[in-house]
């Protein structure tokens, strides 16, 4: 209702919801008109200009409308995105007729350089248009990809009427959390350290055992095992996925621990409200007084994996999103990085206290105020050496991560004192900075005196930041990978593996393909192909050597000793499936060897004793000790042959079958060399040589332990190939006796490992692979975007990395072609754009700081993404033009016919040769990878820039209504003025109690005479000249119908009581309200949907 049509006696201007919706639809996000504006209210220097808000969010001005051209328009604020709005009563208004004119000032604040402006207009109609436009821009996000984070709504529990939530998972747990005073809690079954190292004297938190029950409504109940009574419950649906974390084993010396709870600093980063554990068991204890986090330890790794995925499915996800775009355009980030801490140097200062108390030094890696990884403790050393690596996989940007170097004093009375020596801030920019990919020494500054350097620390950081689309986008890619010829896929890798300059890149590439084909259940096929590739290379080498009449035995003696895609894949795969086996089979023996600290040295030059008689006696004792340890380890391996995971034995079986085909002479020795290279050299010996790297011990090994384990590994490697020690290491020739005695046992063991003969050994390790795992009763669509079990493989991440690799491989081919053409044409030749994949594209999935934080020099329109709906076929998204660019003429007209058939849904005919089918399938796989690559970069560019909107979004009434629900207001007092402050959401828990939604359920007109019966108000502002305390009255009303629409002539009563803002009516209550029509001409229908249809029909017929 415009001000001109208002009755004079009303003295109140209404801003109805329908006016807001109409303004959005007709004026969109732009505004034009004559407005008074200034930058400083106190100066009262108002200027009257023709102001305009453009479709890109710029607030500009010119002298008048006639001069509003590109040369005369000057910007006031360049970007209104995420602006903050305040409405101030204008006591000094030059507009005298308050009934006909607007006497309010709109204050607009942005984070830019010119960050504040005051606006006032003469008419209420213009005021509403301007306010609508500013509200719209306040909901748009500013530039920078990390500013586009959103958090999903809590998962709603769907069950049958009156049905109780079901129990999804039940576990026995050790819990570190708040100790409830009125409940006797049983002690934990496993003795673990406190995560904070120092014991808490008030005993408010501690370890206890409990039964954990995860229910289908997202509640995790902790129960007493004795009688099943409730200790307390956690509402998992109020947690973020980043607040459910698998703890690094270095924190508690346990690999099966999970952190659950609120991270206030993380929530502050995202601007979210608080969450608290709900203490249900004890009425005497206030839930707000207890800790808001717990740590749970599971008995088995598979239990942790199952529960982790189930909890993640209920938690709220963090994702990047463009306002108004389809959900298939949402992205999650994988912020993966590895921090290596090598050593520190504090030799320039004295670390001892005045009593020379014994101490240890260590480094914590913290983020959001919590410790997530910890180095081992080094005693009484000002130059501590660690060389430890820690892997992190975050879903968010890190804003406040630190390396905290701490000193722990061990007093005589067994009390511990902790001292923070210094800390170094690790930002996201440092993590992604390639300069830290090599060992870098950083200064450590004093905690109290930031200008005083107390030492240095040497670190190395490698990182990988990926932007991942929802799983729906990868459906076609997965189908192609399921049916692809893996030999042709491997050709892509081996063609480019020579360009992989270091082992890290080779390892990363191997893991990508390993994870993908393991998640697709094609892992054995993949190893078949990789082994064929490696053996083909060896066969070619042998043929060339034989042509020269030379001996080729040395080629087979070094079989799989070098690094390749195959060996790196096998290392990762064997340790993944065999980690539990290694732990249960060898960890106890290795700990015993290390803790004994008795030498096994046989080299006389290394024995420090000068007396020859005593030296011989020492060497003899060492020989017995070495023989005993090696015998104990071998017997353990031999006795547990049937416990070795079948996945490992299947790969060894494939390998042996391949070798027996190509090797005619000396087959047994070649097989022994090959099995040794895979099983002993790459599986058993790395764990024996460095048990700390594999988390079997927590402390660094001393020189004696390192040498002992090296000697044991040497003997086992020679045993694995039945090779005698010779003159190269004469002191070890004594151990040839051990090898001779185990000759037959070793052959028997190899036959069992390669399934050449049946293994009748009993299974004695009780591995978790023998335990049946419960099937998670969770919707598959929800599980598709979470890591897969077992092993928590992130399939979508690996598919994103696969896409990146395939495109990079194609770009390498293009570069080679360009060089060839350049040479062939005398430097004048150029590649035609259609001849290569992604030609002319400079896009890359590696992200630099400019992409993340700077505006993109393009006009980002959300509408460009409107057509990118959820689909299994990316060809439908990008259309035929891009597909034509991707086609190559080298296949000929036959290939073009195949392309047309594939894109039109025609299946291959049996007449087409299989080789041509496979070639076409590979071409289609590359094309799909290119499409996904461009899609990711297209969306990422939009996310990096300032948000804008297209015309399609303005037509979406549902979005406009949802926008109205997101706007809050708060009356605040600034000096003598009362200010109405508009907010996109509650900023924090300390916001004023007066903070309310702009559009909520209204109060009955009987209790408020200023509100008419037939009005659905968006905002009501009283313009009467009264006391300042009552000068800014707001009355905010709204209605809900079942389909989410809001209709003009309907007011729902608001239930009284604190904290009821945003509550929704139950269907029963809503139905009762609908039985009483709010207006006389509304039919008395019993159903809200029917009522909605009636309103819609009335609107279409013009209300007749």
UniProtKB/Swiss-Prot annotation:
The modification N-acetylserine is found at residue 2. The record marks 561 as: Arginine finger. Keywords: Acetylation, GTPase activation, Phosphoprotein. GO terms for biological process: axial cellular bud site selection; bipolar cellular bud site selection; establishment or maintenance of cell polarity; filamentous growth; invasive filamentous growth; invasive growth in response to glucose limitation; mitotic spindle orientation checkpoint signaling. The modification Phosphoserine is found at residue 854. Residues 1090-1104 have a biased composition (Basic residues). One of its GO terms (molecular function) is GTPase activator activity. The keyword Acetylation applies. Residues 536-753 form the Ras-GAP domain. One of its GO terms (cellular component) is cellular bud neck. Residues 316-444 form the C2 domain. The keyword Acetylation applies. Present with 1230 molecules/cell in log phase SD medium. Stimulates the GTPase activity of BUD1/RSR1. Participates in the regulation of bud-site selection. This is Inhibitory regulator protein BUD2/CLA2.
